């Protein structure tokens, strides 16, 4: 599953911002627009027992250039909410459900 960081029109968004995957699938987050973005999972909004630090990018680490990617596999079933730390205040948030 590929998720774009930044809409094609320049909007600060994950595209898609809500989606489903099967446990163990790889999710590739790809910088689409060239603004600095990252992917941080909210430790309070992921399945119990999952370590947010192990699935998130470090908050100071950014995908700066178009085409740069960050990949993650989620094994525990449930709903995970994530955000871009520089743009969370602008509404750049999303969620994935692992089935």
Swiss-Prot record:
Membrane topology: Peripheral membrane protein
Chief location of this protein within or outside the cell: plastid
One Pfam family linked to the record: Copper-bind
InterPro entries from the UniProt entry: BlueCu_1, BlueCu_1_BS, Copper_blue_Plastocyanin, Cupredoxin, Plastocyanin
GO molecular function: copper ion binding; electron transporter, transferring electrons from cytochrome b6/f complex of photosystem II activity
SUPFAM superfamilies found in the cross-reference section: Cupredoxins (SSF49503)
Phosphoprotein as UniProt keyword: no
Location in or out of the cell: Plastid, Chloroplast thylakoid membrane
UniProt protein name: Plastocyanin
Species in which this protein is naturally found: Vicia faba (Broad bean)
Lineage: Eukaryota, Viridiplantae, Streptophyta, Embryophyta, Tracheophyta
Gene coding for it: PETE
